[in-house]
Structures are given as C-alpha cells and as structure tokens.
Amino acid sequence: VFEESYKHNYDSLYEATNTQPGQYNYYDSQWHPYFNKTGLHTMQSISKSFTAAAIGIAIKNGHIESVDVPIKSYLKEYEPSFSDKKKEAITIKDALTMRAGIKWDELSMLYTDTTSSCVQMEASEDWIQYVLDQPMENEPGKKWEYSSGVTMLLSKIIFEATGDNVSDYLEKELFEKIGINNYYWKQTPKGLTDAEGGLYLEPRDLAKFGYLYLNNGLWNGNSILPKDWVKNNSAELIDTIWPAFKYGQQWWFIPYDKDNIAWLASGLGGQRLLIVPEFDIVAVFTGWNVYEITALNSYLALQKVLGSILK
C-alpha cells in the first residue's frame, strides 16, 4: 500500500514556530506529537471516541440511566447556565452526536487561531463554564456542529455520575481489561480529564481499542462494551459538512457501498483509527501533519488502504 515512509526531526521542525508556552501549544515538540519524546503518541480527537466508550460503560454499570437524560441533571453546579429552555433540553445523546445546538466555531479555522471556540475554551480556567456560556444557535438534536466543547461536557458528566475522571474510569473499566498499560491524559486547569483531545497512546494500543469495536465490545470472550452500545453508534448516520463522512456518537463513518460502512476515529495532525467490519480490518495511522504537508496526509494513506481492499 505504501511506497514511501517519512522520518523527521520534530525539534528542528518546531524550532521556527515554537514560541507559545503551555501544554496546548500545538507547535511544542515536548507535547506533540510524542508525549515528552516517549513512545506515547498524541491521539488528539480520537480521545472523543474513548470518551463515548466511557459513557457506554457507565450506562452498562448503572451510573447513567440512558443517553436520553438531560445533561443538566449532571451539571448541577452550573445550574445558572441553563436559563435558556433550549439549553435545558440538551440530552447526553445530543452531546454524543454533536447536535447540542450550542453555538461553536471550530472547523472553519486552524487550531492556532485564537478566535477558534476550541482554542478559547482551552485558554479558559473553567472549560465547562466556557462551553455553557455560549448561546444556543439551534434546537438540540436538530443540526450537526462539530464541537470539542460538548465532549468536555461528557467528561464532566462521567465525573459526576461515577465519581471518577474519565482517565481513572477508563483505566479500571477498559484499559486494564484489554491490556493498555502505558498512556497519558492531559487535564484542564480544574483537574478534569481533557476528554476531547488529551489522550496519548502507543499505536498498538489504539489498535486494541479498534479491535474491541470490531468484535462488538467483546475482548477474549468478555463483554467490555455493551453490544447494543457498539451497534447503536452506527444506527443513525448523521450528515456532516463533508458529504463522504457521516457521524454517529463521537465516531465518524464512511459509507462505501449500499450496505457497508467503515468506522473512523480521527484526530488533528493525522491520527486515524480505521475499522472495516466487512473485511475484519483494523488500521492505525499516526502523524503530525499540522504543516499541511501533502505527502504526510493520512487521508491519502486511508484512501490507499480502502482502495486496495475494495478493488
């Protein structure tokens, strides 16, 4: 599939651009693409798919009743932020499917643009408050709008429902059970797990997560994720701003013929987890294509993989 491979000295690549301090500087080689130059690679928004898994496990364990529960039920300390009746009606499912209706602008600009809703959230002291301070733009459940902010609401919901941060909850309920031992999660200034983009994993362990979904939540015959939870992810394919890509519950989907779809968890810079159930395939790509270098574009690699499979 691949005719060429690329190796780069990330320190030299970042030398000209690494001018902003802090863990959310996307051009800081201490954080990106490897955590402190270890084998742990940034997952970026693939973290969102892990957060969705945490919600599914919390429902399985009885910590959360269902995805139809309003998010307000778990965000009591932010009750004054729910004066808008539309905001009060947002459910966990609305957040999972990126249809919360909260005004958010993230995909129309680079993540180094200070006007980005995501960048402004990450620069704030209280990420949850920042998200809830944004006005409602649409009725909940009606329109898709990609938002790292609503994933952070899910992070807070996990904490309130289980008493554990997403990082701690997944460690005992998922990672230990499928053999993920080395990882790192960033935290917000308030100590909440950065569930929208803060996970670092080794690529092999990301493949384990994909294999879990390929097998409908089973690992060595043991149910880690409810089978219905996995299947419900693709039960409703939501239109996005890209016609070829649909959305489920913190997962992307690529329909490639009348009856089949590929699953895709995707993150900034070239992080991709591709699952093709029809052919029992799990493929992992990592990179750091924040410089828009075409040769490093993992979507091109993904197209080659799908193309070779579907010939």
Segments (PLM) and residue ranges:
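A short, well-structured edge-of-sheet supersecondary motif
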Residues: 1-33, 274, 280-284
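Active-site helix/loop module of the DD-peptidase/beta-lactamase fold
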Residues: 31-32, 37, 61-102, 133-135, ...
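Active-site SXXK
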Residues: 42-67, 95, 154-158, 206-209
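A small/polar active-site loop signature that marks catalytic segments
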Residues: 101-187
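Active-site-proximal alpha-helical segments within enzyme catalytic domains
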Residues: 150-157, 197-218, 271-287
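Active-site Gly/Thr loop motif
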Residues: 180-182, 187, 230-284
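Structured C-terminal helix/loop/strand segments within mature extracytoplasmic catalytic/sensor domains
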Residues: 265-311
